[in-house]
Amino acid sequence: MISKKKMMAASLMALVLGFSAMAFAADKPAENPFGLVYRGAITQNEKGKVNIRPVEYKVEGIKVAANLYLPADYDEKSSKSYPAVTVAHPNGGSKEQVAGLYAQRLAELGYIAIACDARYQGESGGEPRLRDYPSNRIEDISGMVDYLSTLPKVDKSRIGSLGICGGGGYTLAAAQTDKRIKAVASLSMFNSGRVRRNGFLDADIKGAQARMQRAAAARDKELAGEIVYEGFLPPNSTDEQLRAKMAELPENTLYRDGIEYYGLTHRHPNATGSYTTESFMKLMAFDVEDRMDLINQPLLMIAGEKADTLYMTKDAFAKASGTENKELFMIEGASHIRTYWVPEYVNKAVNKLKEFYGKYL
């Protein structure tokens, strides 16, 4: 007999795979002058406060657009150097959402923080748009480390990394081999390869071959100039339609809360929730758990106690056998997406990050 849990997971998987379009309908671009869409976001740069500096650089010849967050006491003329942290955004997200929120909060703690749009996404370059290869996302994180290392005010011996959702999985993967990362943390980690391969909650393992066949067909279409997309946000939906779709799903679940966050409360035109179907060919060969033992840096994994994605954090954490300093920190009452924006949960995560980076950077 199929369990209710797996039936729900299969329904969620059908939702994720059922929408093939590049974007949802946004009323208008973000009104914040920096495009930021989170609560308490910087609206102007002022002396004596955290400042934001949009920057561009290249990774493997492709333009990367990023926001650099500078602490309130930042002074290029002083002799002081600063610890720094890279922040990798979730799958389908952008630097102006939760990644920007946590980067700003880290800057408030005295870190130089950087959040970039993954290549092929957001304001970064790369064609076709919304290609989602794990190798690209991992290199984007090392690329942020590269950029920070060029800044004279950054202490290169004190660079850490934070990854959120899918960015958390890719940050763990980057830290496995990039030892310039001295302390690594994840928030609501999402193992992208495992989910694309096995289905959410491992509920559709038998469907893996069909997904790979669909990816192969999409690659053939790309050769003819047609790009095929997957995504969890119904294309061109009104707010009312998005709310109706949410009502079909249980509360405090990843995809229900994801529709609310990305489609309604924190939507941004660069955060479409979509990726090229052809990307499955690379995604399904990836699993962050494969080499977790290579992480020898201090490791902090944060997740919501009620998150339906918690199993991914727990399984990866259990395989991190190469570090003597690791901690799994669960936020009581929090689901996956709620760690992105609910003040109570964000504050708990930030306080834990303050303790962690304060000790190891």
Language model features by range: what are they?
Residues 30-80:
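N-terminal cap/lid segment of alpha/beta-hydrolase-fold proteins
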Residues 79-90:
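Short beta-strand element of the alpha/beta-hydrolase
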Residues 92-104, 118, 313:
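The serine-hydrolase catalytic nucleophile loop
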Residues 105-125:
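Conserved alpha/beta-hydrolase
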Residues 131-152:
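Alpha/beta-hydrolase active-site loop
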Residues 172-259:
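Alpha/beta-hydrolase-fold enzymes
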Residues 295, 301-303:
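Short beta-strand/loop motif that positions the catalytic acidic residue
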Residues 334-346:
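Catalytic histidine-centered segment of alpha/beta-hydrolase-like enzymes
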